[in-house]
Amino acid sequence: MTETAIPDVQSSPDKRHIAINRVGIRDLRLPLFIENAAGEAMPTVARAALMVALPHTQKGTHMSRFIRLLDLKTPISVSALPTLHQKMLDTLHAEEGTISLSFPFFIEKSAPVSGEKALLDYEVVLAVDGNRKHVEVSVEVTVPVTSLCPCSKEISQYGAHNQRSHIVIYAQYNPNQPFSIEDLIHIAEEGASCPIWSLLKRPDEKYITERAYEHPKFVEDIVRDIAMVLNDDPRISFYRISSENFESIHNHSAFALIEHQK
């Protein structure tokens, strides 16, 4: 009995001759290990998007090949993104493409006075985009912080309104230089009135309250202070910073954004 060959429809020619910029899979949820600055493998659950350009001559891409690209046992580092991108292009026989991984990233933080330890989560997006000759690698972090209003402090006899804020930093960097997720998180926290912690005792709360009061900042101050740090960082070629204060005395947020191509 002769076996009948199964048709490979997606590899057949396409008569419309229209190229597709990106085709692939998105919102693929899977467990991964992310390498932190200390070289440790941190477990998380990521949402992945993997896409390539499709030439006008080809009907479809090989969707099943995207799934095999991500090795669930090997930790993914920021520095490994260009290699993963090249592997995707080779596997899909493509000339350009994009990979994006979004996930919660946990850091064990010690409370500022008591030293009590607990995990704090940050939203992170790692991405690489480009062709066989040039790629752009980016890291985006969303960092929760505390902000305290300078105007409120100035006009009040005691106290000042403060609130939780989100700082988002998106940075494209030189893949040939060492760079970590924690680098951007640290820059964001230093740019706020005060960082936040998951576990605090009374001495820690006193410290946070007083530190925020001593470092009042508008959203404008936050993004400008962070921009000054990123301007001096030779590893970064482009950045976008935003700060959103979830105002405690209003039913709206305050927002500021700076982006800069070096």
Curated annotation (Swiss-Prot):
Coiled coil: none annotated. GO terms for molecular function: GTP cyclohydrolase I activity. Pathway: Cofactor biosynthesis; 7,8-dihydroneopterin triphosphate biosynthesis; 7,8-dihydroneopterin triphosphate from GTP: step 1/1. The keyword Hydrolase applies. Disulfide bonds: none annotated. InterPro entries: GTP_cyclohydrolase_FolE2, GTP_cyclohydrolase_FolE2/MptA. Keywords: Hydrolase. It catalyses: GTP + H2O = 7,8-dihydroneopterin 3'-triphosphate + formate + H(+). The record marks 149 as: May be catalytically important. GO terms for biological process: tetrahydrofolate biosynthetic process. Its EC number is 3.5.4.16. Converts GTP to 7,8-dihydroneopterin triphosphate. Belongs to the GTP cyclohydrolase IV family. This is GTP cyclohydrolase FolE2. The lineage of its organism: Bacteria, Pseudomonadati, Pseudomonadota, Gammaproteobacteria, Cardiobacteriales. The gene is folE2.
